[in-house]
Amino acid sequence: MQFRAATLLVFIFQFLNIFIEANQQIQKRDDDNVRYITSDGVVYKYAIKTSTLAPASVVVYTRYYTTTIVREITLANNEVTTTTEEITSASVSSASVTPSASSSSVSETTTSKSESAASVSSSISSNNDEESEIPDQSFLDNDSSSVSSYISSMSPETSSSTSSSSTMHNSTVSSFMPSSVDNSGSDFSSSSSSSSSSSSSSSSSSRSSSSMSSSISMPISSSSSSSISSCSSSSSFDFDNKSYSISKSDGTCYVYYEDDEYYSTVYLTKPGQSVDAATTIKSTKTVYKTVSAN
């Protein structure tokens, strides 16, 4: 019985020795993949295998849309009225996602102008139902907003075309009076002035052009309106958060509207005369093109 017990113990010790040696061989074989991590003075031993998944390459091109807003107003002897507001916009954008096998990532953001202008056009209808097309060839000529104001004046008795202009790099305000306004001796005059030029005429064509950084200060509103009930010797009224003064002299009602940088005074001397003014705002925003290549 003692012999069997001793033999069993020897067998157990030999088995344990073989197991320990095999384990040591395995650890020795895996020494190349072993990383030692220390924390609080304790050494931990791990066999670590790492793999990195690279993110996908994303290329996005966006062309910002250009919006043209046309607001028209009519100034007459007895009323100030707004007409329909027209907004035209167009946008083009594209995006693509492709996988990448590399783990390195390079990202850059560039600001540039769009290579192709969105085709946006609008028209201004005057009292004689003739349309003048707003030029759009320089929508994206510069990064800043371009403001081009069109002022056309006419009498209901005439049918001549009155509004034409083109968008410049710098904002240009042009005032136009019809070439013929009631040729039967009517007195229709206009004066426009700014910091650089001014002109006025009576019963003839009048034009004033000056480069400015802001739009013409015409009463612009799409929902509010105001009326002048009577033309007293001296009165005023408010429209679109602006104050307008009215004066009467020799039976003629005069309406004045102005601001700090630009003002235009139109003299309405006949009951049938009116002034159509349209302000066109062309806002071109910078195109942001983000390219992430992996």
From Swiss-Prot:
Family classification: Belongs to the DSE2 family.
Major location category of this protein: secreted
The organism's place on the tree of life at top rank: Eukaryota
Gene: DSE2
UniProt-annotated location(s): Secreted, Cell wall; Membrane
Residues covalently joined to lipid (GPI-anchor amidated aspartate): D276
Membrane topology: Lipid-anchor; GPI-anchor
One GO term describing the cellular component: extracellular region
Function: Involved in pseudohyphal growth, cell wall metabolism and required for the separation of the mother and daughter cells.
Keyword entries, A-Z: Cell wall, Cell wall biogenesis/degradation, Glycoprotein, GPI-anchor, Lipoprotein, Membrane, Secreted, Signal
Propeptide residues according to the Swiss-Prot or TrEMBL record: 277-294
GO process terms (BP): cell wall organization; pseudohyphal growth; septum digestion after cytokinesis
Protein name: Protein DSE2
Region annotation (Disordered) ranges: 85-246
Positions with biased composition (Low complexity): 85-126, 144-236
Signal sequence region: 1-22
